[in-house]
Curated annotation (Swiss-Prot):
Pfam family, one: Anti-RecBCD_p2
Role, per record: Modulates the activity of the host recBCD nuclease. And thus protects linear double-stranded DNA from exonuclease degradation.
Cited InterPro entries: Phage_P22_anti-RecBCD_p2
Species this chain originates from: Salmonella phage P22 (Bacteriophage P22)
Name of the protein this chain belongs to: Anti-RecBCD protein 2
Domain of life: Viruses
Amino acid sequence: MPAPLYGADDPRRCSGNSVSEVLDKFRKNYDLIMSLPQETKEEKEFRHCIWLAEKEERERIYQTAIRPFRKATYTKFIEIDPRLRDYRSRYGAISNN
C-alpha cells in the first residue's frame, strides 16, 4: 500500500466540507459579487491611476532605500598611466586590457 502524500493530514489543506457545502459557499459568494453595481469606465480608470501612483511611490521609496542620493566624487574618468596603456604580452603582442 503506497504512503499518503506529504501534507495530506495538514488541517490547512483539508477543508472538511462536502461537495454541497462547497457549492453553497461558491453560490453565495458568486451572488454577492454579481449584486455589486457595475463599475463605469471612468471609475475604473480613476482607480487604476490611484493604484499606479501608489505603485510608483512604493518604487521610489524602494529605490531610495537601496540607492540613497549621493553626489558623484568624480566627474571624469581617472587618467590611465601611459606606461600601462600598451602592455606587451607574450610574443611581443600589445595587450590593452
